[in-house]
A protein has these predicted regions:
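Residue-level signal for glycine
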Residues: 305-307
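N-terminal secretory signal peptides and thylakoid transit peptides that target proteins
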Residues: 1-19
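N-terminal active-site segment of His-dependent metallophosphoesterases
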Residues: 27-93, 182, 186-187, 194, ...
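Short acidic, glycine-rich surface-loop motifs adjacent to enzyme active sites
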Residues: 199-215
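Active-site flanking residues adjacent to catalytic metal/cofactor-binding acidic residues
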Residues: 45-46, 78-79, 161, 208, ...
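Hydrophobic residues embedded in beta-strands of well-ordered beta-sheets
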Residues: 296-298
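Extended active-site neighborhood of metal-dependent phosphoesterases/phosphodiesterases
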Residues: 63, 82-202, 219, 223-239, ...
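Residue-level marker for buried hydrophobic side chains located in beta-strands
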Residues: 41-43, 74-76, 113, 206, ...
Length: 317
């Protein structure tokens, strides 16, 4: 039977992905992408549901991945607690959605976290203050930067953003608009410009909850495209990681690689291919990353431990 154009494109996409993943599935790419002088870390978002809707399954696979390649830290890209954030540092969700879910020994490393739109429904300051209760939880401020050494000669600067004030609020979030409106976007934008300008690290990675571009349910974020993307281009940022859409995606805007890791729980299957899409799948899962001096290896893994996609981001001059 003759294939339609859509069937042909889908077949070609699957075949191309299978070819690309073949060396990784055999273990050769993992070994090549994980030299002794490298930084391993995990990224997950949109997760805090009292262990429900695949959260426990994803947590289990994160632990197994970190057993294989020990993660120095974990990045949470926001929407840490559903549906309405946390009320205080004593909120039961700290236990039911975090401490009692990510229990693997390999996950007892620093978690560097940012806020998502659902976190804005609750007490944002409590997420900053919780570090005093649990040393592995880290959110020094609503936006911040930090540096990690890759090896003796190379470092990476991470820039953690507070993107909810940059987003178009959903109808059910309008009651929380005061919390969002109180944030000074111009100040955050000036901070990011200055921080990127001051960075001398060969690797620059930006983390936000909301996407630049996305084929997922929420789609693109116009403010980020207009105001943040030009800064990423200007200062040679290699990668931007986000959540918000409950799926796994790799998109590209010029030389900047955009990764969605919003599959921490309750996946959404609505996903379309855009002009920027390189990969996308509506499923639960997370990202395992390995950063060496010359390349960043990104692996997308689902809640059953299946490797769905892998790619390498080269260092930019």
């Amino acid at each position: 039977m003759k294939q339609t154009r859509r069937q042909f494109v889908r077949t070609l996409f699957v075949a191309t992905q299978a070819t690309a993943l073949a060396p990784l599935l055999s273990g050769r790419l993992l070994a090549a992408g994980n030299p002794a002088a490298a930084l391993n870390f995990l990224l997950v978002g949109d997760w805090g549901r009292n262990g429900e809707k695949d959260q426990v399954a994803v947590a289990k696979q994160m632990g197994l991945a970190a057993d294989q390649n020990p993660a120095k830290f974990i990045i949470s890209v926001g929407d840490n607690f559903y549906e309405d954030g946390v009320k205080s540092v004593d909120d039961p969700q700290w236990q039911s959605s975090f401490e009692q879910v990510y229990t693997a020994a390999s996950l007892q490393v620093p978690w560097w976290s940012i806020l998502g739109n659902h976190d804005y429904h609750g007490n944002c300051d409590a997420q900053i203050e919780y570090h005093l209760r649990s040393p592995r939880w880290n959110m020094p401020a609503r936006y911040y930067t930090r540096t990690e050494q890759i090896d003796a000669a190379n470092a990476v600067d991470f820039f953690y953003l507070d993107t909810t004030p940059m987003s178009k609020l959903d109808a059910d979030e309008l009651m929380f608009h005061g919390n969002v409106k109180s944030q000074d976007l111009a100040r955050q934008l000036a901070w990011l410009d200055a921080a990127l300008a001051a960075s001398t690290a060969p690797w620059k990675i930006v983390v936000g909850h909301h996407p630049v571009y996305s084929g997922g349910q929420h789609g693109d974020t116009p403010y980020i495209i207009k105001h943040i993307l030009p800064l990423l281009e200007k200062y040679g940022v290699q990668a931007y990681f986000n959540g918000h859409d409950h799926d796994l995606q790799h998109l590209q805007a010029g030389k900047i690689n955009l990764f969605c890791t919003g599959g921490g729980s309750k996946p959404r299957t609505q996903l379309k291919t855009t002009a920027h899409t390189k990969f996308g799948l509506g499923c639960s899962g997370f990202i395992a990353a390995t950063l060496a001096a010359e390349q960043l290896d990104v692996r997308m893994i689902d809640d059953q431990g299946k490797l769905l996609y892998a790619t390498t981001v080269p260092r930019r001059a």
